[in-house]
Amino acid sequence: MWVTRQDSVNFQQEYLIENKILDARSEKNTLEIFKSPAFEEIALLNQKQLLLKTLLSQESELLAHVPLCVHPTPKRVLIAGSFNLEVAFEALRHEETQVDFLQKDEKILHSLISFFPHFQETLHHPRFRVIEEIDSLKSYEVIIHTSLLSLEEIAPLFASLSLDGIFITRLENLLLHTESMRRYLLGIAHHFSIAMPFVSPFSLNADSHFLFASRRFHPQADLLLQRADMLEGLHCYHAELHESAFVLPKFLADSLQGSIKN
Protein backbone atom coordinates (compact mmCIF):
# COMPACT_ATOMS: atom_id res chain seq x y z
CA MET A 1 0.00 0.00 0.00
CA TRP A 2 1.02 3.57 -0.62
CA VAL A 3 0.08 6.92 0.89
CA THR A 4 0.12 9.77 -1.63
CA ARG A 5 0.49 13.51 -1.29
CA GLN A 6 -0.06 15.71 -4.34
CA ASP A 7 1.92 18.96 -4.37
CA SER A 8 0.71 20.19 -7.76
CA VAL A 9 -1.32 18.90 -10.71
CA ASN A 10 1.93 17.63 -12.22
CA PHE A 11 3.74 16.33 -9.15
CA GLN A 12 2.97 13.92 -6.33
CA GLN A 13 4.94 11.93 -3.77
CA GLU A 14 4.20 8.37 -2.66
CA TYR A 15 5.35 6.55 0.48
CA LEU A 16 5.16 2.81 1.04
CA ILE A 17 3.08 1.86 4.10
CA GLU A 18 2.32 -1.46 5.78
CA ASN A 19 -0.91 -0.86 7.70
CA LYS A 20 -2.93 1.82 9.45
CA ILE A 21 -2.33 1.90 13.21
CA LEU A 22 -4.49 4.88 14.18
CA ASP A 23 -7.50 6.73 12.79
CA ALA A 24 -8.71 9.75 14.78
CA ARG A 25 -11.31 12.32 13.77
CA SER A 26 -12.59 15.53 15.30
CA GLU A 27 -14.97 18.22 14.08
CA LYS A 28 -12.31 19.97 12.00
CA ASN A 29 -9.41 17.53 11.55
CA THR A 30 -8.57 13.97 10.61
CA LEU A 31 -5.46 12.04 11.59
CA GLU A 32 -4.23 8.75 10.18
CA ILE A 33 -1.00 7.10 11.30
CA PHE A 34 0.53 4.32 9.21
CA LYS A 35 3.32 1.85 9.87
CA SER A 36 6.20 2.60 7.50
CA PRO A 37 9.19 0.38 6.65
CA ALA A 38 11.33 3.43 5.82
CA PHE A 39 10.22 6.00 8.43
CA GLU A 40 8.78 3.83 11.27
CA GLU A 41 5.49 5.76 11.17
CA ILE A 42 3.84 8.31 8.87
CA ALA A 43 1.18 10.72 10.14
CA LEU A 44 -1.28 12.08 7.57
CA LEU A 45 -3.26 15.12 8.71
CA ASN A 46 -6.37 16.17 6.79
CA GLN A 47 -5.29 14.10 3.78
CA LYS A 48 -2.52 16.58 2.91
CA GLN A 49 0.07 17.21 5.62
CA LEU A 50 2.62 14.42 6.08
CA LEU A 51 4.94 13.93 9.05
CA LEU A 52 7.67 11.29 8.82
CA LYS A 53 8.61 10.05 12.28
CA THR A 54 12.31 9.36 11.73
CA LEU A 55 12.78 12.74 10.01
CA LEU A 56 10.85 14.93 12.46
CA SER A 57 14.02 16.52 13.80
CA GLN A 58 15.12 17.71 10.35
CA GLU A 59 12.32 20.23 9.87
CA SER A 60 11.60 20.90 13.56
CA GLU A 61 15.19 21.91 14.32
CA LEU A 62 15.40 24.18 11.30
CA LEU A 63 12.09 25.96 12.01
CA ALA A 64 12.94 26.57 15.66
CA HIS A 65 16.64 27.37 15.56
CA VAL A 66 16.78 29.56 12.44
CA PRO A 67 14.89 32.43 14.12
CA LEU A 68 16.05 31.68 17.66
CA CYS A 69 19.72 31.77 16.65
CA VAL A 70 19.22 35.17 15.00
CA HIS A 71 17.08 37.14 17.46
CA PRO A 72 19.28 38.15 20.43
CA THR A 73 16.51 38.08 23.07
CA PRO A 74 13.68 35.75 21.99
CA LYS A 75 11.67 35.71 25.21
CA ARG A 76 8.27 34.88 23.71
CA VAL A 77 7.65 32.44 20.85
CA LEU A 78 4.33 31.63 19.19
CA ILE A 79 3.99 28.39 17.20
CA ALA A 80 0.87 27.93 15.09
CA GLY A 81 -0.48 26.06 12.09
CA SER A 82 0.36 22.50 13.06
CA PHE A 83 0.25 19.75 15.66
CA ASN A 84 4.03 19.34 15.51
CA LEU A 85 5.11 19.63 19.15
CA GLU A 86 8.69 18.86 18.17
CA VAL A 87 9.08 22.46 16.95
CA ALA A 88 8.14 23.61 20.45
CA PHE A 89 10.53 21.09 22.02
CA GLU A 90 13.38 22.52 19.95
CA ALA A 91 12.44 26.11 20.82
CA LEU A 92 12.51 25.23 24.52
CA ARG A 93 16.22 24.36 24.24
CA HIS A 94 16.77 28.13 24.36
CA GLU A 95 16.79 29.14 28.02
CA GLU A 96 14.29 31.77 29.19
CA THR A 97 12.20 31.34 26.03
CA GLN A 98 8.47 31.00 26.71
CA VAL A 99 6.54 29.04 24.06
CA ASP A 100 2.84 29.43 23.29
CA PHE A 101 1.47 26.66 21.05
CA LEU A 102 -1.74 27.71 19.28
CA GLN A 103 -3.99 24.67 18.88
CA LYS A 104 -7.71 24.27 19.56
CA ASP A 105 -8.06 20.59 18.67
CA GLU A 106 -7.09 18.80 21.87
CA LYS A 107 -8.40 15.44 20.65
CA ILE A 108 -6.11 15.23 17.62
CA LEU A 109 -3.17 16.71 19.53
CA HIS A 110 -3.37 14.02 22.22
CA SER A 111 -3.84 11.31 19.58
CA LEU A 112 -0.21 12.00 18.60
CA ILE A 113 1.14 11.11 22.05
CA SER A 114 3.09 8.09 20.80
CA PHE A 115 4.13 9.67 17.50
CA PHE A 116 6.13 12.62 18.85
CA PRO A 117 9.19 11.43 20.81
CA HIS A 118 9.10 14.40 23.21
CA PHE A 119 5.31 14.75 23.58
CA GLN A 120 5.08 14.45 27.37
CA GLU A 121 8.31 16.33 28.03
CA THR A 122 7.10 19.26 25.94
CA LEU A 123 3.51 19.32 27.16
CA HIS A 124 4.58 19.47 30.82
CA HIS A 125 7.48 21.87 30.39
CA PRO A 126 7.14 24.89 32.73
CA ARG A 127 7.89 27.32 29.88
CA PHE A 128 5.30 25.80 27.52
CA ARG A 129 1.56 26.20 27.23
CA VAL A 130 -1.16 25.33 24.72
CA ILE A 131 -3.44 28.26 23.88
CA GLU A 132 -6.71 28.33 21.92
CA GLU A 133 -6.48 31.94 20.78
CA ILE A 134 -3.88 34.69 20.58
CA ASP A 135 -3.92 37.33 23.29
CA SER A 136 -4.25 40.61 21.39
CA LEU A 137 -2.34 42.43 24.13
CA LYS A 138 0.67 40.13 23.90
CA SER A 139 3.54 40.43 21.43
CA TYR A 140 6.08 37.81 20.38
CA GLU A 141 9.70 38.14 19.34
CA VAL A 142 9.30 35.06 17.12
CA ILE A 143 6.21 33.69 15.36
CA ILE A 144 6.51 30.34 13.56
CA HIS A 145 3.53 29.33 11.41
CA THR A 146 4.10 25.88 9.96
CA SER A 147 1.26 25.89 7.43
CA LEU A 148 0.79 27.80 4.20
CA LEU A 149 -1.35 30.90 4.76
CA SER A 150 -3.07 33.22 2.32
CA LEU A 151 -2.14 36.90 2.46
CA GLU A 152 -5.49 37.59 4.13
CA GLU A 153 -4.86 34.97 6.81
CA ILE A 154 -1.31 36.06 7.48
CA ALA A 155 -1.95 39.78 8.06
CA PRO A 156 -3.56 39.46 11.55
CA LEU A 157 -0.46 37.65 12.84
CA PHE A 158 1.69 40.70 12.13
CA ALA A 159 -0.17 42.57 14.89
CA SER A 160 1.21 40.06 17.42
CA LEU A 161 4.81 40.39 16.22
CA SER A 162 7.12 42.70 18.14
CA LEU A 163 8.72 45.57 16.22
CA ASP A 164 12.03 43.68 16.03
CA GLY A 165 10.34 40.29 15.68
CA ILE A 166 11.02 37.43 13.26
CA PHE A 167 8.21 35.78 11.31
CA ILE A 168 8.54 32.28 9.82
CA THR A 169 5.92 30.70 7.58
CA ARG A 170 5.69 27.87 5.06
CA LEU A 171 5.80 28.50 1.32
CA GLU A 172 4.67 26.35 -1.55
CA ASN A 173 7.48 24.58 -3.36
CA LEU A 174 9.43 27.35 -5.10
CA LEU A 175 10.35 25.12 -8.04
CA LEU A 176 6.78 23.95 -8.68
CA HIS A 177 5.02 27.25 -7.95
CA THR A 178 7.59 29.90 -8.83
CA GLU A 179 5.27 32.56 -10.24
CA SER A 180 2.54 32.26 -7.60
CA MET A 181 5.18 32.36 -4.85
CA ARG A 182 6.79 35.42 -6.44
CA ARG A 183 3.44 37.22 -6.16
CA TYR A 184 2.95 35.89 -2.63
CA LEU A 185 6.37 37.13 -1.54
CA LEU A 186 5.63 40.54 -3.04
CA GLY A 187 2.48 40.71 -0.93
CA ILE A 188 4.41 40.00 2.27
CA ALA A 189 7.63 41.86 1.54
CA HIS A 190 6.23 45.38 1.94
CA HIS A 191 5.61 44.64 5.64
CA PHE A 192 9.30 43.85 6.30
CA SER A 193 12.83 45.09 5.65
CA ILE A 194 14.06 41.50 5.22
CA ALA A 195 12.05 38.77 3.47
CA MET A 196 14.04 35.72 2.37
CA PRO A 197 12.95 32.18 1.45
CA PHE A 198 14.86 29.18 2.77
CA VAL A 199 14.74 25.45 2.19
CA SER A 200 15.31 22.49 4.47
CA PRO A 201 18.48 20.91 2.98
CA PHE A 202 18.21 17.20 2.09
CA SER A 203 14.49 17.14 2.95
CA LEU A 204 12.40 14.44 1.26
CA ASN A 205 9.26 16.57 1.56
CA ALA A 206 8.45 18.78 -1.41
CA ASP A 207 6.81 21.35 0.88
CA SER A 208 9.89 22.09 3.02
CA HIS A 209 10.17 25.66 1.73
CA PHE A 210 9.81 28.56 4.18
CA LEU A 211 10.04 32.33 4.57
CA PHE A 212 12.13 34.32 7.05
CA ALA A 213 10.80 37.86 7.48
CA SER A 214 11.86 40.63 9.85
CA ARG A 215 11.93 44.41 10.07
CA ARG A 216 15.38 44.32 11.66
CA PHE A 217 17.32 41.05 11.53
CA HIS A 218 19.04 39.34 8.60
CA PRO A 219 19.10 35.51 8.80
CA GLN A 220 22.74 35.25 7.71
CA ALA A 221 24.40 38.53 8.72
CA ASP A 222 22.83 38.45 12.20
CA LEU A 223 23.31 34.73 12.87
CA LEU A 224 24.62 34.27 16.42
CA LEU A 225 27.32 31.72 15.65
CA GLN A 226 28.20 30.93 19.25
CA ARG A 227 24.57 30.24 20.14
CA ALA A 228 24.08 28.03 17.09
CA ASP A 229 27.23 26.03 17.80
CA MET A 230 26.54 25.69 21.54
CA LEU A 231 23.26 23.80 21.04
CA GLU A 232 23.67 20.18 22.12
CA GLY A 233 21.86 16.98 21.21
CA LEU A 234 20.79 18.05 17.73
CA HIS A 235 20.52 15.72 14.73
CA CYS A 236 20.61 18.19 11.84
CA TYR A 237 20.91 21.90 12.61
CA HIS A 238 24.25 23.71 12.81
CA ALA A 239 25.52 27.14 11.77
CA GLU A 240 26.74 26.16 8.30
CA LEU A 241 23.46 24.38 7.51
CA HIS A 242 21.61 27.51 8.67
CA GLU A 243 23.51 29.71 6.23
CA SER A 244 23.25 27.29 3.32
CA ALA A 245 19.46 27.00 3.71
CA PHE A 246 19.11 30.53 2.31
CA VAL A 247 21.23 29.90 -0.80
CA LEU A 248 19.06 29.60 -3.92
CA PRO A 249 20.07 28.35 -7.38
CA LYS A 250 20.80 31.27 -9.72
CA PHE A 251 17.85 30.58 -12.03
CA LEU A 252 15.45 30.59 -9.07
CA ALA A 253 16.96 33.71 -7.52
CA ASP A 254 16.62 35.42 -10.92
CA SER A 255 12.97 34.33 -11.23
CA LEU A 256 12.16 35.68 -7.76
CA GLN A 257 14.12 38.91 -8.22
CA GLY A 258 12.19 41.87 -6.86
CA SER A 259 10.13 39.78 -4.45
CA ILE A 260 13.03 38.90 -2.11
CA LYS A 261 14.36 41.57 0.25
CA ASN A 262 17.84 40.74 1.52
Swiss-Prot record:
Spermidine binds at residue 84. The keyword Methyltransferase does not apply. Its EC number is 2.5.1.16. It is found in: Cytoplasm. Residues 1-262 form the PABS domain. Belongs to the spermidine/spermine synthase family. This is Polyamine aminopropyltransferase.
